[in-house]
Amino acid sequence: HGRRRAPTIDETPLDQCLRPGVKLDFRALPDGYVATAADVEAELKRIGHALQPYDIVVVNTRAGEVFGKPEFIHSGCGMGREATLYLTERGVRVVGTDAWSWDAPFSHTAKRWAETRDPKIIWEGHRAGREIPYWQMEKLSNLASLPPDGFEICCFPVKIKGASAGWSRVVAIFDDG
């Protein structure tokens, strides 16, 4: 009845790290907003993309615009449990964001927690990985320059035995042919 052990960064399946990319543009969502499955579905419809298993989905929040400034850790929306499961239930296994975290900025989550005292809202996007494991990348740059799709993402992680995280040089690859 115990929890299964979370996979570590050295166990990342490398075949999942060079895949077609999809960008969700959530820059218009307010700081601290928790994106839902409906938000993801609406954005996919807007850009005309049908998710495929192993697509790499990156989320463009407004946080990337203020990277390196004090407000960075308070900026951008986050991906909630429901939004994360929407992706992973459809076979997505690698995701990324330009924000400090996949989840809503913690300063906003702390305010919501003070009002509700609901522990389920803390790191809810991260914890969705307990149901369907996935890999996430944070603090990505230049997402605003990407189209919604039509590119591949390469994101091989540095292999650190037993680590819960690691570094990756993430690049978008376009076929000019």
Features from the language model and the residues they span:
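Active-/binding-site microenvironments in catalytic and ligand-binding cores
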Residues: H1-G177
